Amino acid sequence: MPVSALAFEPLVDVQARNMGEAQADVAIRGGIFETTGFRAGAVALYDPQTGHYSAEIPAAPAMLSAPTVLTGADNALGGWNANAGTIAYEWRRVRTGGMASAGAGDNRLWRAEAYQGWVSPVGAGGRRLAADVAGAWSDSDGSRTFGESRFRRYNARLQLAGDGGQTDLFYGWQSKFISWPNLYTPYNVIESDDLRTELLVLNHREELGGGDFVAAGAYWRRNVDHYVYNRTGATPGPSNHTTWVRGAGAEGRLTTGTFAWNFSANFIADKLESDTLTWGRFNTRNHTRASLAPETSWALAGARKLTVLAGAVFDDTNRDASAVSPVARLALANAAPGALADELYVSYAASSQVATYTALNSRPSAGLFRGDPDLGREKARNTELGLKGARGNWAWTAAVFHRSERGLVDWIYSTSLPNARVASAVDIDTTGIELVARYTGRRLDLVLGYTGLRKDADYGNASADASFYALNFPEHRLTAAVTVRAGRGWEIRLDNEARRQKPNALRVTGDDAVLSAVEVSYTPPRWSALRLTAAVDNLWDSDFQDVPAVPAARRQWVAGATLAW
């Protein structure tokens, strides 16, 4: 499950409700779930109802690459409708082979997954036809009363691939039922969400050499949502929503003479049908986005190279005002022995995005979720200074950044409206530092991270006694992932996180937390295709609330086996 794989990634903050695979928001650099985008190949994936559902990507991890986290200028050029950052996946090359896994744990947890890939021995034009299929299943009663979840996912893909490029035709279907106390609201009720997500993608990428490439794609997505605020009460009744998205995108890098031209374009058409989100001005919207940023380089003395990039991004919809956002980056590469960093860079990137329908079309004057049809385009300016380096088995990155956002749509709580959560625009400045070090060895892997954040917020005339999202952030966060290959087939993985959260009136369990997960695996030396695992999540049984007022999942264990062929 793609979101679960990000749980202890130092560049990403996963805010889970129950297990990450049940429901989780993904935040980057102190942003919120609505300011995080997702890409698969050349297309930007999106749910127009709410950013909660943009992370519902019905694709097996075996079909996707490891994610790249885009921030700053990279996000401004390669992201879409995401002012903080983008999780970018590529389509993995199919290989002949497969795997099957099954596991069980406490709270009547069981899970299973299967994958099979085939590559045809017959080729044409230097490329071969391949196909793969996958399925995943998971059920649990949950670690809290009325905390059950059910998950099903099925995938099929055709691929034509060779040394020069790759074409993928993918279909995914996913169903997910989640129930949890205070799933989205702080009113001590049992809420549930029942989702059905379909995704059809056609993507092509052609490698041109020297770092140049061209990629293009198109997709269709449908998400059906059945939300119940109070499972144990008669009112209010359920809410039903269906969204459709049709999108196309292209991106690339082409070198002509001394200039390399970085470009991208996206078109997305969305539609909402809902029995409650009916108070806005529209329920369809067309989005257009294009970016162009040429870059050039100069060789300097001492094995150094200076690269300058400058360009702009154009965003428009048929419902909102358009915006032109400048992007610039200056990078100094240093290949001299003994240099502290392989690259030093400074960048400035402006970006913009528009609100989703839950914020725009919820009833403004009554109800549990209060919307505002007048919410406008959200704008951000990001300035960043950073470095990258690698020596021997170590690699590291460091960045200091400042993001100034105007009109960010947050959901707030006010004692003057104790029975509602309200969509409100906020002007917010975020200053942060981000440090990551990675070590890869024969017996040991380490991933160490630190993030420090500070925010200054202005809600204008809105009465905001607490923020569900924009002011739910760690002032300090340390992560440490340790993988030990102990020999004779044994491997131990420890994922750890320590955080000091910004105080929040809605969080009732404290603002400091130490969270850990451990997995022990064994591969018999004479049967390397088999892997046995035992894992514990929330090892210290912490009650820290990732999302304010949402109870934490308790300690859970699972044991299983994976067979590969």
Task: Give the location of each predicted region.
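Flexible loop and strand-edge segments within Gram-negative outer membrane beta-barrel domains
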Residues: 140-151, 165-247, 277-278, 282-283
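Outer-membrane beta-barrel signature, preferentially recognizing the C-terminal barrel domain
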Residues: 184-210, 241-243, 343-406, 414-440, ...
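C-terminal beta-signal and adjacent terminal beta-strands/loops
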Residues: 501, 520-565
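Short acidic/polar hinge/loop motifs at secondary-structure boundaries
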Residues: 43-71, 85, 89-91
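Short strand-turn segments of transmembrane beta-barrel domains in outer membranes
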Residues: 68-74, 85-120, 135, 139-148, ...
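Extracytoplasmic beta-strand/coil segments of soluble accessory domains associated
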Residues: 4-47
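Gram-negative outer-membrane beta-barrel transporters
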Residues: 297-308, 395, 401-404, 423-505
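Surface-exposed extracellular loop regions of Gram-negative outer-membrane beta-barrel proteins
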Residues: 115-140, 174, 218-228, 260-269, ...
